[in-house]
UniProtKB/Swiss-Prot annotation:
Family annotation (InterPro entries): Elong-fact-P_C, NA-bd_OB-fold, Rib_uL2_dom2, Transl_elong_fac_P/YeiP, Transl_elong_KOW-like, Transl_elong_P/YeiP_cen, Transl_elong_P/YeiP_CS, Transl_elongation_fac_P
Pathway assignment: Protein biosynthesis; polypeptide chain elongation
Cellular localisation: Cytoplasm
Alphabetical list of SMART domains matching this protein: EFP (SM01185), Elong-fact-P_C (SM00841)
GO molecular function: translation elongation factor activity
Record-level GO BP terms: peptide biosynthetic process
Main location: cytoplasm
GO CC aspect terms: cytoplasm
Protein name as annotated: Elongation factor P
TM segment ranges: none
Keywords assigned: Cytoplasm, Elongation factor, Protein biosynthesis
Role noted for this protein: Involved in peptide bond synthesis. Stimulates efficient translation and peptide-bond synthesis on native or reconstituted 70S ribosomes in vitro. Probably functions indirectly by altering the affinity of the ribosome for aminoacyl-tRNA, thus increasing their reactivity as acceptors for peptidyl transferase.
Family: Belongs to the elongation factor P family.
Length: 187
């Protein structure tokens, strides 16, 4: 059990028998009336996002989630195989569980897998990943008044928009949450 004062991003709540992760929250103390907490919750299994408001100080059920360091090994048909870094046990996870994070998964990458009662829930990538550009068109400078972007294909097959000066073979830092370009990696 936890109270609204314990809310933080990533906390997993049990609501109506389902697991929900807090992805955003705001404590509100209006001039008139009691304080409350607005939360944005994401269903762990379905990915559905809902807004829910709690009165301040309310107790809520929390789930114990074990986040384990793993290494992504390979893809086997519809499954992604991860190896636990402590006991070297391999966990094949279905594509539905890996979700959108699959577009930035590279063999040998260290990621975290969240477990609840021994059942894998979801995969967490590092916030920034370093990937190489495998294909992009040459950028033409000077034909626009502001900085432009162009599409680029990364070594995982994901496509992102990058500045015009990026070339094939460059290694980039990419935000794994939204796929945005963060910068070049100095080699």
């Amino acid at each position: 059990m936890a109270t609204t004062a314990d809310f933080k991003n990533g906390l997993v709540l049990v609501i109506d028998g389902q697991l929900w992760t807090i992805i955003g929250f705001q404590h509100v103390k209006p001039g008139k009336g009691p304080a409350f907490v607005r939360t944005k919750l994401k269903n762990v299994l379905s990915g559905k996002v809902v807004d829910k408001t709690y009165n301040a100080g309310v107790k809520v059920d929390t789930a114990t989630v074990d986040r384990r360091d793993t290494t992504y090994l390979y893809r086997d048909g519809a499954n992604f195989v991860f190896m636990d870094s402590q006991d070297y046990e391999q966990h094949p996870l279905p594509e539905s569980l890996v979700g959108d994070t699959a577009r930035f998964l590279l063999e040998g990458m260290s990621v975290q897998v969240a477990f609840h009662n021994g059942v894998p829930l979801y995969v967490e990538l590092p916030v920034t990943v370093e990937l190489e550009v495998t294909h992009t068109e040459p950028g033409l400078q000077g034909d626009r008044s502001s900085a432009g972007t162009k599409p680029a294909t990364l070594e995982t097959g994901a496509q992102i928009n990058v500045p015009l000066f990026i070339n094939t073979g460059d290694k980039l830092k990419v935000d794994s949450r939204d796929g945005s370009y963060l910068g070049r990696v100095n080699v």
